[in-house]
């Protein structure tokens, strides 16, 4: 893909793979969309992965995971590297709070399901990039009883602000 598109930042919405080829440029969103389409066109399962905010800068990033040898491997979109699981973002991803992707339809895999809709399932794939451990959050009222339907915001502190990475409303007391 690096032969078809050069990186160029913009604030525009993500364009289609064909538009990226026609203009010969795009940001990480366009480049990763192009590579996912190219890999899928030759029968390689692929998905776009996204972090809404890095721990070290007030910016986001998108890249690609491709299925090979029984597991997902990551690669930069139009950033050629000689091997899989190597990118400029290895170190930042290891400190990230959230790396996610959307799977069309219902998903019953090993990754944490963050959101399910009629059309897609959003999953957290951070365990592909960093050591993780389960975290249980219990919201209680002043009497110490669990609160049903409590909303919890998971935030990342960076650039003197708390950025919401995930908003979770519990369906039951937790």
Give short role names for the model-derived ranges:
Residues 1, 5-114:
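Hydrophobic/aromatic-rich core segments of domains that either
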Residues 50-53, 59, 125-131, 148:
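Membrane-proximal bilayer-interacting regions
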Residues 63, 136, 151-153:
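Conserved beta-strand and immediately adjacent loop positions that scaffold enzyme active sites
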Residues 112-132:
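Extracellular ectodomain segments of secreted/surface proteins
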Residues 133-141:
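A short, amphipathic beta-strand motif
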Residues 142-160:
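Short, ordered, surface-exposed loop/turn motifs in non-cytosolic proteins
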Residues 162-167:
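Short, intrinsically disordered, charge-balanced linker/junction segments flanking boundaries
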Residues 168-174:
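Conserved small/polar residues in nucleotide/adenosyl-binding loops
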């Amino acid at each position: 893909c690096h032969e078809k598109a050069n990186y160029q930042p913009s604030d525009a919405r993500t364009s289609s793979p064909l538009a990226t080829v026609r203009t010969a440029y795009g940001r990480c969103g366009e480049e990763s969309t192009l590579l996912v389409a190219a890999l899928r066109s030759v029968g390689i399962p692929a998905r776009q992965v996204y972090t809404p905010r890095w721990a070290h800068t007030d910016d986001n990033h998108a890249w690609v995971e491709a299925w090979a040898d029984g597991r997902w491997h990551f690669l930069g979109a139009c950033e050629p590297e000689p091997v899989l699981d190597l990118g400029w973002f290895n170190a930042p991803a290891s400190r990230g709070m959230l790396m996610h992707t959307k799977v069309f339809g219902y998903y019953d895999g090993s990754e944490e399901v963050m959101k399910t809709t009629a059309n897609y399932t959003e999953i957290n794939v951070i365990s592909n990039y960093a050591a993780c451990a389960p975290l249980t959050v219990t919201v209680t009222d002043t009497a110490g009883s669990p609160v049903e339907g409590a909303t919890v915001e998971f935030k990342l502190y960076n650039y003197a602000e708390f950025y919401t990475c995930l908003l979770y409303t519990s369906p039951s007391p937790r």
